[in-house]
């Protein structure tokens, strides 16, 4: 289930869009491993990718939340964003390393299902609200 960047994901902020592209690229790396399904132990590689994804997501979420504060984004939508960001990180951190070691492909596929659904919802619903806010602000409508 490769995720391809599409303009529908654009949040009207070049930096956020570039960061979303990077997150998609990292999720697609995980997908490549899941598609191999060749019986080779890739535990260390998978853990490294998961840790990189978590670290990059924390960096990205920090950037977004800083933007919310700097642009005067409303507190209700900021809180929704923060809760979703925390949920994402918590999910990555909750991966049971024993389960991963025992069932690499199954664990990776389960996480991919979560990641693809979360990313689609988060960007297309939650982040696009912020993108629309930025667009209106730039147009002088706010």
Residues covered by each model-derived region:
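Small-residue-biased structural context
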Residues: 1-142
């Amino acid at each position: 289930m490769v995720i391809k960047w599409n303009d529908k994901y654009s949040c009207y902020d070049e930096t956020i869009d570039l960061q979303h592209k990077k997150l998609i690229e990292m999720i697609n790396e995980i997908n490549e491993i899941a598609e191999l399904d060749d019986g080779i132990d890739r535990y260390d590689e998978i853990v490294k990718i998961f840790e990189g994804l978590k670290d990059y997501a924390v960096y990205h979420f920090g950037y977004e939340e800083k933007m919310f504060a700097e642009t005067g984004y409303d507190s209700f939508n900021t809180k929704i964003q923060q809760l979703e960001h925390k949920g994402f990180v918590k999910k990555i951190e909750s991966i049971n390393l024993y389960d991963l070691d025992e069932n690499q492909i199954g664990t990776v596929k389960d996480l991919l299902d979560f990641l693809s659904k979360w990313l689609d919802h988060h960007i297309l619903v939650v982040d696009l609200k912020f993108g629309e806010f930025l667009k209106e602000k730039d147009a002088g409508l706010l």
